[in-house]
């Protein structure tokens, strides 16, 4: 095989991007031609340039200069040497070799274009100050990458690119870039600082701390590392302090410490999402549930995959009776942690609570807690039934009267369920007596019957007997159906105004196991009357 065939074979390898094979063939061509043909050196220089390692670029420059030496008019020798110098960030040498070519051929377009390219790169680099780049990171990153595509080993731009990547929150990319630089210069304080910064924003505090400390070891005056180290330690200290206060149940102090930690570096998102979640936990114990929800929202806004914050917010939503929101948060947490069986139970509980919330809340209607016992429920019913009974509100405007009647109906429904142990248990479980979802309407309940039975049985267990209730004449209790109040005391009339209002004079109540005459019969006889002035007045 002669040198021309070796060159042709090398060109074929070059076209296939098999540069090492191309170099081997070009080297054979050079040897077979006794190193006298400039184009062979030029071709090998192009292959070395394409590989673009630091050493291959040096080889490309060497071959390009040899080609120029053999043939001064070999223009590609000047341009390839220039490109290799540019990749090595040796811009003065690149400009110098182009000037040499222009001396030989002042109007050569390839050389003039290369000169313009060198000038453009240098202008761009001069304009890319750190302050300008960080103030407009997206645009600056495009400019930096454009220059680095032609000037691969400009370490100044590589460091600036890493800083811009950090500003754009592309922390792993920044860390990887600085790792490459540190492999060549492990004691460079700026390299150590910038990689430490990328680790810090990835919440890798121990390794970030080590980088900042090493940076200061090699340059005690490197101020950026000193500031970063102080900031890191402050955040760690305040977070630890907040956790300790929380463990000791000093929740206000914990809240204050977490708040201070959050103020140190607003850009420290991963850590801040944890701090928001921790502060939310303190707020829950301070019974500031709405604020806790806001902090959890801040946490998941920063880190949409922060499962613990979704769970904490769901728990807060349950406390606020925002059951649909709680279900959504629990389901999001489960999607992040499918193996967590507890979350499935949480979702079920939240869905049941949501179904319950669509019914009338009988506990709220009676104004009692869910832990209220029989006595408290009866007491609440007595008070509200007397307050909202239709006979008391007969003179109200129609709208208010309708509201009072609805309230009286709801009170009766509530008492009918909560006073019955079985119904109450089913209601608490979200079921009706047939095991189906509880129907809030309770349409089958006779509210007046509930009222009548309650007071017939003595309500709170002591009965209403003893004293007569005189002065109750006038029409009866509307809607109570003739029967009246049997068994409410032996023969004593109703004295005073048991419902806090005047029933007027007139006819009595028949069929109540003792006459309820207006001012006749036993209205003042038998047991002592409980008048509206008596100490045992019912209101």
UniProtKB/Swiss-Prot annotation:
Residues 521-531 have a biased composition (Basic residues). GO terms for cellular component: phagocytic vesicle. TPR repeats lie at residues 3-36, 75-108, 189-222, 235-268, 273-306, 307-340. InterPro entries: DnaJ_domain, DnaJ_domain_CS, J_dom_sf, TPR-like_helical_dom_sf, TPR_rpt. It holds the Pfam family TPR_1. Keywords: Chaperone, Repeat, TPR repeat. SUPFAM superfamilies: Chaperone J-domain, TPR-like. Residues 512-539 are annotated as: Disordered. SMART domains: DnaJ (SM00271), TPR (SM00028). Residues 361-431 form the J domain. Gene3D superfamilies: DnaJ domain, Tetratricopeptide repeat domain. This is DnaJ homolog subfamily C member 7 homolog. It comes from Dictyostelium discoideum. The lineage of its organism: Eukaryota, Amoebozoa, Evosea, Eumycetozoa, Dictyostelia. The gene is dnajc7.
């Amino acid at each position: 095989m002669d040198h021309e065939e070796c060159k042709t074979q090398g060109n074929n390898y070059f076209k296939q991007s098999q540069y090492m094979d191309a170099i081997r063939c070009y080297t054979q061509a050079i040897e077979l031609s006794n190193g006298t043909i400039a184009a062979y050196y030029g071709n090998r220089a192009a292959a070395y340039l394409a590989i673009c390692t630091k050493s291959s670029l040096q080889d490309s420059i060497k071959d390009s200069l040899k080609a120029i030496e053999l043939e001064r008019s070999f223009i590609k020798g000047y341009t390839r040497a220039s490109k290799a110098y540019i990749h090595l960030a040796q811009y003065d040498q690149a400009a110098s070799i182009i000037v040499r070519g222009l001396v030989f051929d002042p109007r050569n377009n390839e050389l003039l274009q290369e000169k313009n390219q060198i000038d453009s790169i240098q202008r761009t680099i001069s304009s890319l100050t750190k302050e300008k780049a960080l103030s407009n990171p997206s645009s600056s990153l495009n400019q930096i990458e454009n220059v680095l595509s032609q000037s691969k080993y400009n370490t100044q731009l590589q460091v600036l690119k890493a800083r811009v990547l950090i500003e754009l929150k592309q922390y792993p990319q920044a860390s990887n870039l600085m790792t490459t630089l540190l492999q060549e210069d492990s004691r460079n304080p700026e390299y150590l600082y910038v990689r430490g910064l990328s680790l810090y924003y990835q919440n890798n505090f121990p390794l970030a701390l080590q980088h900042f400390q090493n940076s200061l070891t090699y340059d005690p005056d490197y101020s950026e590392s000193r500031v970063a180290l102080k900031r890191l330690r402050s955040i760690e200290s305040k977070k630890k302090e907040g956790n300790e206060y929380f463990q000791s149940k000093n929740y206000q102090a914990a809240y204050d410490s977490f708040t201070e930690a959050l103020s140190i570096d607003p850009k420290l998102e991963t850590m801040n999402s944890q701090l928001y979640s921790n502060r939310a936990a303190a707020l829950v114990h301070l019974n500031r549930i709405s604020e806790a929800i806001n902090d959890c929202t801040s946490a998941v806004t920063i880190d949409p995959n922060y499962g613990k914050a979704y769970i904490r917010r769901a728990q807060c939503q349950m406390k606020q009776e925002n059951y649909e929101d709680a279900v959504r948060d629990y389901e999001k947490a489960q999607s992040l942690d499918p193996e967590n069986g507890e979350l499935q139970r949480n979702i079920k509980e939240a869905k049941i609570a949501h179904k319950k919330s669509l019914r009338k809340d009988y506990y709220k209607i009676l104004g009692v807690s869910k832990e209220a016992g029989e006595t408290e429920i009866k007491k609440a019913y007595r008070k509200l039934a007397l307050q909202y009974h239709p006979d008391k509100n007969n003179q109200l405007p129609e709208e208010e009267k309708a509201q009072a009647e609805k309230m009286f109906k709801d009170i009766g429904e509530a008492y009918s369920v909560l006073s019955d142990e079985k119904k109450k248990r089913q209601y608490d479980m979200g079921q009706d007596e047939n095991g189906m979802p509880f129907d809030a309407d309770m349409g089958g309940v006779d509210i007046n019957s509930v009222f009548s039975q309650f007071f017939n049985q003595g309500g709170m267990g002591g009965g209403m007997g003893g004293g007569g209730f005189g002065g109750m004449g006038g029409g009866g209790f509307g809607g109570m159906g003739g029967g009246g109040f049997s068994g409410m005391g032996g023969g004593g009339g109703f004295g005073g105004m048991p419902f806090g209002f005047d029933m007027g004079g007139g006819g009595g109540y028949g069929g109540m196991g003792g006459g309820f005459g207006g001012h006749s019969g036993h209205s003042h006889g038998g047991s002592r009357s409980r008048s509206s002035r008596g100490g045992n007045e019912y209101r």
